[in-house]
Amino acid sequence: MDDHQEEGPEKVKLFGMWASPYVLKVRWALSIKGVEYEYVEEDLRNKSSDLLEHNPVHKKVPVLLYRGRPVAESDVIVEFVDEAWSHRGGRILPDDPYQRAMARFWLSPPIWKWFTAAPGEGQEAALGAAVEQLQVLEDLLAVGGKEFFAGESVGLVDLSLGAMAYVVPMYEEIIGVRLVTEERFPSLSAWMGRFLDSPPVKDHPPPVERLKPRYRAMREAFLNMG
């Protein structure tokens, strides 16, 4: 349990699990805002009574406890954090309503099917679809030569796509197929490096080496299901 919590009426607690990219996304958002909090690591095979009490519908992490009141689901939590601490740190969501809507569009990017596809025509089709989707992201970054999708600092789209920066290289290693290269996606490739070097991610870096065996097992499970 990490002792990163706010004193007094704004005491904040986060229930999470080390391997979850959704939990990492919330931790990065809290870091952007400079929010101190208590972190509670959950065993998802033996969920605590506190987690079940605070998220009785989905019974999963992350759950943020703020002034004794729970907020569940990572996307909801990130927006809550941005609004609850609007006076601190950088803005996560754009102020402009249209830009805010466009940022929300990328909350769940559909690029992961290629990891679950078996070698052969199915994998080739999934890779082709992933390349098309990544090209859209490449073009978004290339316009104006932006450092991040939000501009000069990490924002909602960067947090939503952040798992790509460390999961895609792991997928490539496991499958043996290169997807994001400097030649094919120069802006996106550079963004992945910048994102991993950004302050919120360096505060809570993804545990890549610990994750690799987990993703290899997931890949095998997907293939065996086919």
Predicted segments with their positions:
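A contiguous, mid-protein "functional segment" used to position or interact
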Residues: 183-209
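Membrane interface segments of multi-pass transport proteins and intramembrane proteases
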Residues: 93, 178-182
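Alpha-helical scaffold segments in carbohydrate-active enzymes
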Residues: 105, 133-136, 160-167, 187-197
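GST-like domain detector, emphasizing the conserved glutathione-binding G-site
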Residues: 1-149, 153, 220-223
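Surface-exposed helix-capping loop/turn segments at secondary-structure junctions
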Residues: 139-151, 173-175, 199-205
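GST superfamily/GST-like fold recognition
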Residues: 151-175, 183-189
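Short amphipathic alpha-helical segments embedded in low-complexity Lys/Glu-rich regions
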Residues: 47-48, 116, 178, 208-213
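C-terminal helix/juxtamembrane-tail motif
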Residues: 209-226
